[in-house]
């Protein structure tokens, strides 16, 4: 009996320590940098983007944002799941205010959890702070005398996505960035659609992983159908405020000409 009590005590302490570690991991503030050389950027100055997705219940850390600002991004893109059910409107707005301090345009696309929030309240916050919202549409973006396009696809899980509508006005000769919360958008893209960069989140990198095993793959970069892509682990968590083997992350993405 005494041995079993000791074992139970050891297991309890170990479980508590592991939970504390997972909680601390979930509160991390990591800024990853990526450089995508693209043929359409030849002869143009580099374009730098701060990309963040899956914020959920977190407040974006000010020191993290200061570090990101040091890269002088031209654009901020929120890849969906800015919030979820139960997140106070004041916290959502505070996160937007913190991003507004970059002093550059902010683009937002919807994630599945954003639909758990009162839509009129989200729109009110976006309108108050000049956030550009994309729902199956595209907008031009100019920097340093050059113009690119950003297309945003609405959430796939909520069956709100209309990819063809989002890209219908794109000029294949110019640089085109596609933003969709769910990386399953890769399946809808054709090689001749003129998409150069795809930014997504949603998966949280599995959020809780045991070695190579998790509900989703870790976030990553790569090439699919002639487009460079980034799938982010995301910044926040859902269900439980814990992470294991899938650190939270935000991103500085630099698009430049080939060497």
Swiss-Prot record:
One of its GO terms (cellular component) is membrane. Keywords: ATP-binding, Nucleotide-binding, Signal. InterPro entries: Calcineurin-like_PHP_ApaH (IPR004843), Metallo-depent_PP-like (IPR029052), Metallophosphoesterase_sf (IPR051158). Pfam families: Metallophos. SUPFAM superfamilies: Metallo-dependent phosphatases (SSF56300). ATP binds at residues 214-221. One of its GO terms (biological process) is lipid A biosynthetic process. One of its GO terms (molecular function) is UDP-2,3-diacylglucosamine hydrolase activity. Residues 1-19 form the signal peptide. Induction: Transcribed under partial control of SigM ECF sigma factor. Gene3D superfamilies: 3.60.21.10. This is Uncharacterized protein YpbG. The gene is ypbG.
């Amino acid at each position: 009996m005494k041995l079993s009590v000791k074992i139970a005590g050891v297991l309890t302490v170990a479980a508590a320590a592991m939970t504390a570690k997972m909680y601390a991991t979930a509160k991390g503030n990591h800024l990853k940098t990526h450089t995508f050389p693209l043929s359409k950027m030849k002869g143009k100055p580099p374009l730098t983007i701060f990309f963040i997705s899956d914020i959920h219940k977190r407040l974006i850390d000010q020191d993290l944002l200061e570090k990101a600002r040091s890269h002088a991004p031209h654009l901020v893109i929120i890849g969906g799941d800015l919030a979820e059910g139960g997140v106070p409107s004041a916290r959502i707005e505070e996160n937007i205010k913190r991003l507004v301090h970059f002093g550059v345009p902010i683009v937002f696309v919807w994630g599945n959890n954003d639909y758990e929030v009162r839509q009129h309240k989200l729109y009110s916050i976006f309108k108050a702070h000049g956030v550009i919202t994309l729902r199956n549409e595209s907008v031009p973006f100019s920097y340093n005398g050059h113009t690119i396009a950003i297309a945003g696809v609405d959430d796939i899980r909520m069956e709100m996505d209309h990819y063809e509508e989002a890209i219908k006005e794109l000029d294949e000769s110019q640089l085109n960035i596609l933003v969709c919360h769910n990386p399953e958008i890769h399946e809808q893209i054709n090689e001749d659609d003129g998409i150069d960069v795809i930014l997504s989140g949603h998966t949280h990198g599995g959020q809780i992983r045991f070695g190579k095993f998790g509900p989703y793959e870790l976030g990553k970069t790569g090439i699919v159908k002639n487009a460079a892509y980034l799938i982010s682990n995301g910044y926040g968590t859902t269900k439980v405020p814990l992470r294991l083997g899938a650190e939270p992350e935000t991103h500085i993405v630099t698009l430049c000409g080939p060497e």
